[in-house]
Swiss-Prot record:
GO terms for cellular component: mitochondrial matrix; mitochondrion. It is found in: Mitochondrion matrix. This is 10 kDa heat shock protein, mitochondrial. Its main location: mitochondrion. The gene is hsp10. GO terms for biological process: chaperone cofactor-dependent protein refolding; protein folding; protein import into mitochondrial matrix. The keyword Glycoprotein does not apply. It comes from Schizosaccharomyces pombe (strain 972 / ATCC 24843). Keywords: Chaperone, Mitochondrion, Phosphoprotein. Gene3D superfamilies: GroES chaperonin. The lineage of its organism: Eukaryota, Fungi, Dikarya, Ascomycota, Taphrinomycotina. InterPro entries: Chaperonin_GroES, Chaperonin_GroES_sf, Chaprnonin_Cpn10_CS, GroES-like_sf.
Length: 104
């Protein structure tokens, strides 16, 4: 039996896992033409929704995550565990899988 989640706030990542919502590409051109879903490229950029407490390093000490809630991050093309909450899609990544923080 599948559990139906009401909100992404109910997902609390464990250890070094990071919950990310992928930023959607524009479906409309600057001139106002709507693009079909198949022609819209999937962006490799996301926003951090929640962060686990961190993983343990080789010395057994807790290593803090390298990102914070609200950060824009560059995502790998593959990987992560996909989660659907209502119509929204989220992904869980390990801290070391995220490629970069986007500062703009």
């Amino acid at each position: 039996m599948a559990t139906k989640l009401k909100s992404a706030k109910s997902i609390v990542p464990l250890l070094d896992r990071i919950l990310v919502q992928r930023i959607k590409a524009d479906t409309k051109t600057a001139s106002g033409i709507f693009l079909p879903e198949k022609s819209v490229e999937k962006l490799s950029e996301g926003r951090v929704i929640s962060v686990g407490k961190g993983g343990y390093n080789k010395e057994g000490k807790l290593a803090q995550p390298s990102v914070a809630v609200g950060d824009r991050v560059l995502l790998p093309a593959y990987g992560g565990s996909n989660i659907k909450v209502g119509e929204e899609e989220y992904s869980l990544y390990r801290d070391h899988e995220l490629l970069a923080i986007i500062k703009e």
